[in-house]
From Swiss-Prot:
GO biological process: protoporphyrinogen IX biosynthetic process from glutamate
Domain notes: Possesses an unusual extended V-shaped dimeric structure with each monomer consisting of three distinct domains arranged along a curved 'spinal' alpha-helix. The N-terminal catalytic domain specifically recognizes the glutamate moiety of the substrate. The second domain is the NADPH-binding domain, and the third C-terminal domain is responsible for dimerization.
Enzyme type, top EC level: oxidoreductase
Catalytic machinery residues: C50
A Pfam family annotated for this UniProt entry: Shikimate_DH
Annotated source species: Shewanella frigidimarina (strain NCIMB 400)
Name of the protein this chain belongs to: Glutamyl-tRNA reductase
Misc remark: During catalysis, the active site Cys acts as a nucleophile attacking the alpha-carbonyl group of tRNA-bound glutamate with the formation of a thioester intermediate between enzyme and glutamate, and the concomitant release of tRNA(Glu). The thioester intermediate is finally reduced by direct hydride transfer from NADPH, to form the product GSA.
Residue positions binding substrate: T49, C50, N51, R52, S105, E110, P111, Q112, Q116
InterPro entries in alphabetical order: 4pyrrol_synth_GluRdtase (IPR000343), 4pyrrol_synth_GluRdtase_dimer (IPR015896), 4pyrrol_synth_GluRdtase_N (IPR015895), GluRdtase_CS (IPR018214), GluRdtase_dimer_dom_sf (IPR036453), GluRdtase_N_sf (IPR036343), NAD(P)-bd_dom_sf (IPR036291), Shikm_DH/Glu-tRNA_Rdtase (IPR006151)
Residues binding NADP(+): G185, A186, G187, E188, T189, I190
């Protein structure tokens, strides 16, 4: 086997180059077929995300795969080579396991990459570029990634502002199934917050934005209600949680507006998380008895603590991937022994069939049966021990005691 991984990622290449080597979804099927034609067993998988492009091939030469990548995208060899990494055999196996486990990600331990690797595997199956070795490699990798998630705390701590905001809400309210959330803004961060809230089964969401159309587009995906910023005073009293992230140069929520809303809520507590810079919520809101205001700085301190926790978990995860990559390579070596055993058995059976046919012919011609059987036994013995005898003789003549010992052990000569 010659398992090869060729790739570039956020650590080795700029976004400009990563864009040039990326594979669009509509071309990935044909690309994998083309790549597989450069391997001896037709096995290839392409993982292409915003942060990495990696080519996984079995029974291939890395030089051929790099040449294919250059030809496919029309890239200059000198531009690509400084950014390329190439791994083979066990190092390649461990790399894939690390990638799927989030150990090689921009955000340590992020879970999205596992889904992206799984999607690439499914696409390769659809393209017909999966066979025994690559199939087993990816299936094992998915199991390893799951083991890393369950046996370590690598995914337990929030390391993004959006995730940290929702984690704080979960910590304060314990369950989000009965809470109502007001999201202010409709940008990428708020969209990610909405996704995390939906995943955690929040009761309802309202999205307020300066342009109602942008809020409506986001609300369709998350089954939320869209409102304008001017409508916030009407919806604020119903909100248990407020999370805000706009690009407004001035605060969206003032102390007076929040104080009025709290009175209407009969002083039920309200969590407000301001992840905007400059701030969307006046700092004085935090002075109100029933308002619990947190800023982006509060979240960053949580994220820093959690990142340290993830790094500790990553050390455990590295041991898991190291161990599991060795186990996979043992399976690969066992395949090689299976092929050798099959060839040896086939060779021996061919000798047997040849000599039995000769013996039967002699018997049909009236030869003495006892003599025919003795001749068959002698010929069969000589043919079967010919190769081992030559190997023993050669090792002896060369003084190769190590090989001689292995041969004696394999032939059972050292048994008492």
């Amino acid at each position: 086997m010659s398992l090869v991984i060729i790739g570039i990622n956020h650590k080795t290449a700029t976004v400009d180059l990563r864009e040039k080597v990326a594979f669009s979804p509509d071309r990935i099927h044909d690309a994998m077929k083309s790549l597989a034609s450069r391997t001896r067993t037709g096995e290839a998988v392409i993982v292409s995300t915003c942060n990495r492009t990696e080519l996984y091939c079995n029974n291939a030469e890395k030089e051929d795969i790099i040449e294919w990548l250059e030809d496919y995208h029309g890239l200059d060899h000198n531009d690509l080579m400084p950014c390329i990494y190439a791994y083979e055999e066990q190092v390649a196996v461990k790399h894939l396991m690390r990638v799927a486990s989030g150990l090689d990600s921009l955000v340590l331990g992020e879970p999205q990459i596992l889904g992206q690797v799984k999607q690439a595997f499914v696409k390769a199956k659809e393209a017909g570029t999966i066979a025994l070795t690559i199939d087993r490699l990816f299936q094992n990798t998915f199991s390893v990634a799951k083991k890393v998630r369950t046996d370590t705390e690598i995914g337990a701590a929030a390391v993004s502002v959006a995730f940290a905001a929702v984690s704080m809400a979960k910590h304060i309210f314990s369950s989000l199934s009965t809470t109502k959330v007001l999201l202010i803004g409709a940008g990428e961060t708020i969209e990610l917050v909405a996704k995390h809230l939906k995943d955690n089964g929040v009761a309802s969401m309202v999205v307020a934005n300066r342009t109602i159309e942008r809020a409506q587009a986001m609300c369709e995906e998350f089954n939320a209600t869209a409102i304008t910023l001017e409508q916030i005073p009407d919806f604020l009293p119903k909100a248990d949680i407020v999370i805000s992230s706009t690009a407004s140069p001035l605060p969206i929520l003032g102390k007076g507006m929040v104080e009025k809303a709290l009175k209407q809520r009969r002083h039920q507590p309200m969590l407000l998380v301001d992840i905007a810079v400059p701030r969307d919520i006046e700092a004085e809101v935090g002075e109100l008895d029933d308002a619990f205001l947190y800023t982006v700085d509060d979240l960053h301190s949580i994220i820093e603590q959690n990142m340290a926790s993830r790094k500790e978990a990553a050390e455990q995860a590295e041991l898991i991937t190291e161990d599991q990559s060795h186990i996979f390579m043992e399976w690969i070596r066992s395949l090689e022994s299976v092929d050798s055993i099959r060839e040896y058995r086939s060779q021996s059976l061919a000798i047997k069939d040849e000599l039995v046919e000769r013996a039967l012919n002699k018997l049909s011609q009236g030869s003495d049966s006892e003599q025919v059987i003795l001749e068959l036994a002698n010929r069969l013995t000589n043919r079967l021990i010919h190769s081992p005898t030559q190997a023993l003789t050669s090792a002896s003549r060369q003084g190769d005691l190590n090989t001689l010992g292995q041969l004696r052990s394999a032939l059972g000569l050292d048994k008492n």
